Regions:
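Pro/Ala/Gly-rich low-complexity, hydrophilic intrinsically disordered segments
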Residues: 1-2
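Extracytoplasmic
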Residues: 5-8, 18-48, 52-78
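Targeting-peptide/extracellular-domain and disordered-appendage signature
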Residues: 13-14
Length: 78
């Protein structure tokens, strides 16, 4: 019986800010450029712009593409 290899999942976080307006603008700009990102609600006093949960390789590629477009992004383990 074949066992399914568990792939490592990551979240791409583009930006954290205390300004909801700033976070929404960043999410909007990234969406215009074709990135699947969304504005997260305020967590611990910070607004977050994140992408969905991705396989590690996909997340790393997204961070590279975001960097090419001028966005700073971090990989978060989950």
């Amino acid at each position: 019986m074949a066992t399914k290899k568990k792939t490592e999942k990551k979240v791409v976080e583009i930006f954290s800010t205390q300004s909801p307006n700033e976070a929404e603008q960043i999410a909007f700009q990234a969406q215009i450029k074709g990135f699947d990102v969304h504005f997260n609600a305020i967590v611990g006093g910070y607004c977050k712009v994140r992408s969905a949960v991705l396989d590690k390789e996909d997340a790393e590629q997204m961070v590279e593409k975001l960097a090419e477009e001028g966005f700073t992004a971090n990989l978060l383990s989950i």
